[in-house]
Structure formats: structure tokens, C-alpha cells
């Protein structure tokens, strides 16, 4: 029993040399062709490791008429009846030349696209490098700003300490001034008392002298 289902996209299983037929598989398998004149278009080889999907088989221009098989893991998956045909090799060569020119143009187009893609990649690499450099610079600036902030915080702490010391010194000076004011008041009172005593004594002496 064949575990795979094969469907030929062509309306019939008939094919002529130079044709391409499509085989659709629904499971993984190793596909092989029964005649070396045929090959798979995907890898240009007579066998291919297939996953579910569609695979094209090229019927070579040198294929002889008759039934040709396509196998899946050794079991016949499909039969292709290759017709006998008279080939105009000159027309076929012209067709191949045309296809070759088309392929060359496609290759040139792909090369140009590849070149553009490579240039875009280089541009993106340059932009990425610039962004990385900017990120590094921002990191350095951020680190410097952190250091500056830390230094300012240290200066602020020193200023706070100095201010506290100045306040303490000011309190001491104010206390000294109050003490000096108290002492000054005492000195003034003592001086006034001494002056009053002296004046009183002097007046008393004068008064006594006049009586005599």
C-alpha cells in the first residue's frame, strides 16, 4: 500500500520530452525517478528528500517514449507516459537560448538587488555603529553626571557641616556678648556707685569744712 497520494497537475499522465510535470505529496519521503533522463527541478538531481508539497519533474529532451515512474521510498508514486515526438532541435536550441538570456537578465537583476541589499546592510551597520557610539557617549556622560552629582552632594554635606559649625560659633559669640553685656552693666553700676560714693564723701567734707 502506497502511504502517499500523488496527483499530476497535468490533465493527463501524458508528457513529451522537454515538459515539466508536477507531483504533489502529502507526507515526507525520498522521491526518485525511474529514468536518468528525468530529474527534479528543485535540485536538478534524480532524487530529492521531500516534505509535503508540490515537486516539479523535468522530462529530459533525450527521454525515450514509454512509461516512466516516480518512486516514493521505493514504491511507485506516479507513472508518466512519455510520448514519441519529433523535435525541431533548431527551434529547441533557440528556445533554450531565449530562456538562457532571460535567466542571465534575472541573474543580473538579482546581482543588482544583492548589491543594493549589501549597500543597505553596510548603511545599517554604520547607523548601528553610530548608535552604539552614541549610547557609549551617553553612558559616559551619564557616569560623569553621576560623579558630578556625587561631588555636589559631598560639597553640600560639607557646606551643611560648615553652616552648623558657624551657627554653633555664632551661638557662642552671642552668649559671650550677653555675658559681656551683663559684666558691662555690673561695671557701670559699680562705677556709678563709686562715683556716687566719692561725690557724696566730697560733698560731706565740703559741708563739714564750711561749718567749721
Curated annotation (Swiss-Prot):
Transmembrane regions: 186-208
Keyword Transmembrane included in the entry's annotation: yes
UniProt keyword list: Membrane, Signal, Transmembrane, Transmembrane helix
Bilayer topology: Single-pass membrane protein
Signal peptide (UniProt feature, chain positions): 1-18
Gene3D superfamilies: 1.10.287.1490
Subcellular location: Membrane
SUPFAM superfamilies: P-loop containing nucleoside triphosphate hydrolases
Predominant localisation class: membrane
GO CC annotations on file: membrane
Family: To A.fulgidus AF_0540.
InterPro entries: P-loop_NTPase
Species whose genome carries this gene: Archaeoglobus fulgidus (strain ATCC 49558 / DSM 4304 / JCM 9628 / NBRC 100126 / VC-16)
Name listed for the protein in its UniProt record: Uncharacterized protein AF_1225
Amino acid at each position: 500500500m502506497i502511504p502517499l497520494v500523488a496527483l499530476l497537475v497535468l490533465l493527463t499522465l501524458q508528457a513529451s520530452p522537454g515538459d515539466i510535470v508536477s507531483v504533489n505529496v502529502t507526507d515526507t519521503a525520498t522521491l526518485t525517478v525511474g529514468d536518468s533522463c528525468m530529474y527534479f527541478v528543485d535540485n536538478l538531481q534524480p532524487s530529492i528528500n521531500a516534505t509535503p508539497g508540490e515537486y516539479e519533474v523535468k522530462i529530459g529532451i533525450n527521454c525515450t517514449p514509454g512509461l516512466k515512474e516516480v518512486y516514493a521510498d521505493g514504491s511507485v508514486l506516479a507513472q508518466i507516459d512519455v510520448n514519441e515526438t519529433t523535435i525541431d532541435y533548431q527551434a529547441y536550441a533557440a528556445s533554450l537560448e531565449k530562456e538562457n538570456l532571460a535567466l542571465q537578465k534575472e541573474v543580473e537583476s538579482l546581482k543588482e538587488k544583492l548589491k543594493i541589499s549589501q549597500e543597505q546592510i553596510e548603511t545599517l551597520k554604520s547607523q548601528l555603529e553610530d548608535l552604539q557610539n552614541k549610547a557609549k557617549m551617553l553612558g559616559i556622560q551619564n557616569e560623569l553626571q553621576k560623579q558630578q552629582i556625587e561631588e555636589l552632594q559631598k560639597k553640600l554635606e560639607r557646606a551643611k557641616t560648615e553652616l552648623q559649625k558657624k551657627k554653633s560659633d555664632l551661638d557662642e559669640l552671642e552668649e559671650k556678648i550677653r555675658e559681656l553685656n551683663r559684666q558691662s552693666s555690673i561695671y557701670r553700676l559699680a562705677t556709678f556707685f563709686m562715683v556716687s560714693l566719692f561725690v557724696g564723701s566730697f560733698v560731706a567734707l565740703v559741708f563739714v569744712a564750711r561749718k567749721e
